[in-house]
Regions:
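Structural motif corresponding to the intra-repeat A-B loop/turn of tetratricopeptide repeats
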Residues: 15, 44, 92-93, 136, ...
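Flexible helix-coil transition and linker loops at the boundaries of alpha-helical arrays
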Residues: 19-28, 59-78, 92, 108-120, ...
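Terminal, low-structured helical/coil segments at or just beyond the last alpha-helical repeat
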Residues: 201-243
Length: 243
C-alpha cells in the first residue's frame, strides 16, 4: 500500500472512538504498527481497509524468542493477524479452505511459542477451526477433531485451553442435538481446565446446582463468557529502583 493509503488508515485509528496515539502506530516500516492498525480497523468494522493492511503481514516471520515485559510479542502479533484475516476471509468470501489455512497457521504458531501468551487463548484458534467446520456442515469431522485433541492432551491436566475448547465444542454439539444432560456434563468437564477465580468458583457452583439440565447448560454458557483469570501466568514485572 502507498503512503497516502497508510496515513489514511493511521488517521482513522488515531481519531476513532477509542483512539490509539499516532506515535505508537504510524511507522509503516515496523510491521507491528501495521498489525495494530489492521486489527484496530477490523475491530472498527472497517473490514476492507483492515484486510488491505493485514495482508502486508502475511510474509512476516516473527521472532519466536521475543517476549517483552509489556505489550504483545511478535508471535502474538502474527497469530492475531492470522486469526483476523481468517475471520475476514470467512465472513466476506465464505472461503472455507483459505480461512482454515490461516487458522491452522495461527494455531501452529501459537502452539510453537514457548513464552506466555498475553492476548488470547491459544486454544481459541483450534475452536474457531471447529466452528467453521460446523458452519459448512462438517460437524462430524469437527467432533472427531475435538475428540482427537482430547486424546493428544491426555495427562496435560490443570489449565489447558486445548482440552477446554474441545470439551466446550462437544458440549455445544450435544446441546444442538437436544441432549442438554450430556451437554451440561461436558461443559462441567471443560471448566476443569479453565482459569477460574473465587468468583468463578461461585458461578460454577451455581451452575452445577441449577435444577434442570437446560438451566445448567445455560449457566455454563454464561460462565464461558467471563475471563475470570488470565489463561497464562505472566512473569513478575522487573521494576528498576536505581534510576
Amino acid at each position: 500500500m502507498n503512503e497516502q493509503e497508510w496515513q489514511a488508515c493511521v488517521n482513522h485509528v488515531a481519531g476513532g472512538e477509542y483512539p490509539v496515539p499516532r506515535g505508537m502506530i504510524s511507522n509503516y516500516n515496523d510491521w507491528r504498527c501495521r498489525s495494530t492498525v489492521g486489527r484496530a480497523l477490523y475491530w472498527m468494522d472497517e473490514v476492507e481497509a483492515a484486510m488491505h493492511v493485514l495482508a502486508t503481514i502475511l510474509d512476516v516471520e516473527p521472532d519466536m524468542e521475543d517476549a517483552p515485559e509489556m505489550g504483545l510479542s511478535e508471535a502474538e502479533h502474527k497469530v492475531l493477524c492470522l486469526r483476523d484475516i481468517a475471520e475476514i476471509v470467512w465472513k466476506l468470501a465464505r472461503n472455507e479452505d483459505a480461512a482454515l489455512n490461516y487458522l491452522d497457521q495461527a494455531y501452529a504458531l501459537s502452539r510453537a511459542y514457548k513464552h506466555p501468551f498475553r492476548s488470547a487463548s491459544r486454544g481459541d484458534m483450534f475452536y474457531r477451526r471447529l466452528a467453521i467446520l460446523r458452519e459448512v456442515g462438517k460437524e462430524e469431522q469437527a467432533v472427531q477433531e475435538a475428540e482427537k485433541m482430547l486424546e493428544l492432551e491426555v495427562g496435560n491436566d490443570g489449565i489447558n485451553p486445548y482440552r477446554y475448547f474441545a470439551y466446550k465444542f462437544l458440549a455445544e454439539h450435544e446441546h444442538n442435538n437436544g441432549d442438554d444432560e450430556k451437554a451440561a456434563q461436558l461443559f462441567a468437564e471443560a471448566f476443569r481446565y479453565y482459569p477460574v477465580s473465587e468468583a468463578g468458583e461461585r458461578d460454577l457452583g451455581k451452575a452445577a446446582a441449577a435444577e434442570t439440565a437446560a438451566d445448567r447448560y445455560k449457566a455454563y454458557v454464561f460462565c464461558s463468557t467471563i475471563q475470570y483469570k488470565p489463561w497464562e501466568e505472566l512473569p513478575p514485572a522487573i521494576i528498576r529502583r536505581d534510576l
